[in-house]
Amino acid sequence: MKKILLAFAMLVSLTMIKAQPVHTLDLSGTWKVTWNEGGHGPQSLDDYLHTDPFQDPARFMEVPVPMELHLALQKAGLVEDINYGMNTLKARWVAEKYWLYAKTFSVPEEALKEKAWLVFDQLDLNAVIMLNGETVGTHSSAFVPCRIEVTGKLQAGENLLQIGIESGLYGVADKDGGSYLQNMGALLNKRHWMRKPQYQFLWDWNPQLINVGITGAVRLEWTESLRLDQVVVQCHLSDDLQKAMLTVKSFLEGWEQESLKIKTSVLETGQNTLTDIQIKPGLNPYTSKVEIWEPKLWWPAGQGEQPLYHVKVELLDGQTVLAEKNIRTGIRRIQIDQSSHPVVGNYFTIIVNNRKVFMKGGNWVPPEMIYSNVSRERLDALTDMAIKANFNMLRIWGGAIWAGHDLLDLCDEKGLLVWHDLLFACSKYPGDDKEFYDMVKHEVTWGVREFSPHPSLAVWCGNNENEVGTWSWGWDRFGKIMPDYGLYHLLIPVIMKEEDPSRPYWPSSPFSTEFTDPASPVTGDQHPWDVSLGAAGPDFWAYRNYVDRFPNEGGVMGASSPATIRQFLPPDEQYMRSFSWDHHDNEVNFWNYKPGIDYQFVEFWLGKSAEDLGFEKYLLASALIQAEGLNEYISNYRRRMFSTSSAIFWMYNDSWPATHGWTIVDYYLRKKLAYHPVRRAFQPVTTVLAMEHDTVKVFGVNDSPVDWQGTLRYGIFRLSGRYNVDERLPIVIPANASAVLASISAVQWNNRKATGAFGILEKDGKQVAQYRLFTERFKDMSFSKPVVKITRGKGTVTLESDVFVWGACIDVDGEKEVPDNCFDLLPGIPYTIPWTDKEMPKIEFTGNGLF
């Protein structure tokens, strides 16, 4: 009987326990740090990690946390500005040391009695966590937070927290390199084993700078009973778009049975649901649902508005709020149409809210070499410039880091859809290793849950170019054959189905269905690199015949602006091919022992070498050629909509100041000469001219959701002035379509070295878009010195030239807030741009001046 009463008393006691909220103690701030490599301290790693920082305090320096160590040492004057000159080479020692952090702290008395964790939002990379001399945990991924339970390990008074951390080089020292990658750098650093941003190990556009340190916030958490972890929001929109079901999964960690409620509210509609839940021991999901009728739909830029809903999740014990999270989301439906193409292969078209949308944009890389140092302001500026360039999509490339909430929030607000590669790029990965496999499983599960609420996040993709590497790059001829196939085709699809069935998953980029070549142009997505990196080389007119279904990586390089070049080159190295010039240059220029592809581009199109042109003219010539190439890339694909359904180029932004680069916005956020030509090529309504057989076809392209009416002016112009053909006709371009508006017989186009074809769209007497087509290279054409008249109107200026002007630039350094730049002037045809500055614009450079 006593046993029964005791058991009953225990049961009553358990049911009387009330859940308590989670308490936190911020442990960020000032820490102490020292370094060792087996000489500057104990040779034994274990002895080193248990170094008492108070025995020799002079060995330690103070650093802020969170902060990557290159940056912390730069602020302390021990490392020079990594963006300048040769300084990344001077800073490599930082990644080669084993670092030891230390911090003391005291805790409230209740923290000693309750469940407690040390939480690190990010550690890069391999970390050993020690509390009061005891190793309490390890961590080896920069892609997921670190949470270490320390219940019963805290002490009254002062606690000593020590973190031993290294960049990853020590951890892979005895691992297999050659079975996965055989380039020189990978044999040395074995990056494929490390779960951290891969671009740190050197890419063609970025030097090696292997990050290391405590790069995320640090805190102590404690609670008596349970804690709220991640909250997942999934949107399911009915076929008729009239009803949205928000499924909210709250992940709660508990240790005993108890009854609670979850209140889920949508603030904009006033709706809420109250869901009874039974807490079970462990980390488990608890689901609630909210139905919204006639929801306001979220659209990508150019297709509609971006209304956002605020969802509040509260964990209740009676009337007491134990925990809450406020989450912002949007309601939209994403599908990919892969139906059969009437000619060959399949379509690959992203459909948003039952409407086909042509994807326009660029590839995104971390905008700093030290990726944890990217500010919200920098992200805001870059996304603003993307929107102004008429983007509606960014592709987050797989060699980087999670987009993160700050970037995705901005994309949500501005209407930028996101194609997000998972974090694998250009390598075989050890998916056959259980520890690596388990880490990937944890990492992908965490990321898919964490970023689920963002309406901008449209597509998850398994990796960047790992499939095509085996198919086309000879990866099947060495080492392990597709050791990571199971990750992208088995493990991750299961995770996606369980965690986020609301978004499409694509196994690799590029990838094609039906077990065909991953780079097939007629199915799946494509990386059309034959221009720049393949057989076509510098001839970007090859783009004119490309029929790719969904090109999302391909591009043309160009030099950064003179102002940027001078900012990162030391005064005594401000000349072409100086040591710092080459160090900051794209690696592609050194793949062969001959002048690199950038120099070949200029010589191919202009017939002049870099030496012929000289420092300043060469930089502008290279930038102008990039503008031409990207215009060809974009215009070819846009005229083919929706046989082709995207024009996404490589790449949008830079991680450091580059001599030549793929980007249209450089590291210092200066607009390169290609920026405005890309903006015009992406504008919602435009015209494109293309030669097909013996006919010049004039296309009207309209990716807006309404028909466009106006006037088309088209014909053949002479570079020296006058028009051989000059026609006008009223036109209608259907909504969300490309259509042939007119044509010119090739018979009418004579003496092509002195003439070009043109098209202009006008509405209400104002020019909306213009396009010109040449079939002879610039070096073979007859350019004249122009006389340009500039006149002021009401809030505008108008430029008019007596002869054709190629690439008139009013801001060669990309530093001014000009509404347009690097535009052609057709002979005798006014070109008007908005202008409110008191000072009139001046033409600083034209392509004509290169001859």
Regions found by a protein language model. Give the residues of each.
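Secreted/periplasmic carbohydrate-active enzymes, especially glycoside hydrolases
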Residues: 1-10, 17-393, 639-640, 670, ...
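Substrate-binding clefts and catalytic carboxylate motifs of secreted carbohydrate-active enzymes
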Residues: 25-26, 30-43, 206-213, 225-226, ...
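Active-site rim elements
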Residues: 91, 202-206, 479-483, 616-621
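Soluble or luminal CAZymes and related metallo-dependent hydrolases
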Residues: 97, 378, 439-443, 483-488, ...
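Anionic group-transfer/hydrolysis microenvironments
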Residues: 121, 134, 397, 423, ...
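Active-site mouth of glycoside hydrolases
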Residues: 143-147, 164, 170, 174, ...
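Glycine- and acidic
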Residues: 295-296, 390-394, 610-619
